[in-house]
Design a protein with these regions (language model features):
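Intracellular alpha-helical coupling/juxtamembrane segments of multi-pass membrane proteins
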Residues: 250-274, 290-296
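Short amphipathic coiled-coil heptad-repeat segments
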Residues: 142-148, 273-277, 295-296
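Short intracellular "coupling" helices and adjacent cytoplasmic loop segments at the cytosolic face
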Residues: 110, 276-288
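ABC ATP-binding cassette signature C-motif
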Residues: 1-262
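A short, surface-exposed helix-loop junction/capping segment
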Residues: 119-127, 270-281
Length: 296
């Protein structure tokens, strides 16, 4: 398990968002958080990442694990181009590469023990660089940008000239490249065309970490998630399976609730008819029996 939410409680004044809501996300699991507009999905995301305080409850992220959050509104560095902005997601690799290149220049003028020490450092840094797939980070950036619908000609566009939708795509690409252990994605398919949505589906299915998604695109959810977490009238319930499985189980619950309601209504009408019949006898004993049924 990578994320656990226990007995979450949150209200805004008299407006209840969630009462004693609990759910969890396993390592590498792809899950959806669903509910009608205003149910509290984005609020729960903000509580998970600490942007909003909880009234009560606990949010537990496994120690040592990282969390990345794509909100519906993002801030970008307006001095960067699209490509430069995504490079910031690989700043650790770029810093490693700079250290390696600096040591390579030093090695030419070193000898003896000093050379041995610097070679040890060089080998350690190279091992770390390779483990982070450092040789491929530029092609990885290019692949993500193209997957999200940007052409190579657009890579050099300044971020301050982009539309809101383009900025959201840049923010999504940047988050994907940071590769946190769990991704929280709020409406990730907004501003994506069909090809980009298809690319994102494949990317998330192969993503090595966990993913928790809020989306109105049920077709996207159906292809990506294996668990659905529903928030409804302040209550939280988990369903195993994709979105189609959830919808079928939800319909079965509604059908059972409707059947129970109709049975109750039939029983009420039956009791009312018996009461009316007993009262019509206008005898003391019958009236007492009728009053007894009214209390049932």
């Amino acid at each position: 398990m990578i994320l656990a939410c226990h007995n979450l409680n949150k209200s805004f004044g008299d407006h209840l968002i969630v009462r004693d809501g609990s759910f969890h996300v396993e390592d590498r699991e792809k899950a959806a958080l669903v509910g009608v507009n205003g149910a509290g999905k984005s609020t729960i995301f903000k509580m998970i990442v600490g942007e909003l305080p909880l009234d009560e409850g606990d949010v537990i992220l496994t120690k040592g694990k990282t969390l990345g959050y794509l909100a519906q509104h993002q801030n970008l560095d307006t001095t960067n181009t699209i490509y430069e902005e995504l490079k910031t997601a690989k700043s650790d690799i770029i810093a490693l590469e700079a250290q390696i290149r600096a040591i390579e220049l030093e090695l030419k003028s070193l000898s003896g023990e000093e050379l041995t020490n610097r070679l040890n450092t060089y080998n350690r840094l190279m091992s770390e660089f390779e483990s982070k797939n450092g040789y491929a980070y530029e092609s990885e950036i290019t692949g993500v940008l193209k997957g999200l619908g940007f052409t190579e000609e657009e890579f050099s566009k300044p971020t301050d000239t982009l539309s809101g939708g383009q900025k959201t795509r840049v923010s999504l690409g940047k988050l994907l490249l940071t590769k946190p252990d769990i991704l929280l994605l709020d409406e990730p398919t907004n501003h994506l065309d069909l090809n980009s949505i298809s690319w994102l589906e494949t990317y998330l299915l192969n993503y090595p970490g966990a993913v928790l998604i809020v989306s109105h695109d049920r077709f996207f959810l159906n292809r990506v998630v294996t668990k659905v977490i529903e928030i409804e009238n302040g209550s939280v319930r988990m369903y195993t399976g994709n979105y189609k499985d959830y919808a079928q189980k939800k319909q079965m619950i509604r059908d059972a609730q409707l059947k129970e309601y109709l049975n109750q209504q039939r029983e009420i009408k039956h009791q009312e008819a018996v009461i009316e019949k007993l009262r019509s006898f206008n005898r003391e004993k019958s009236i007492k029996r009728a009053e007894s049924r009214e209390k049932m």
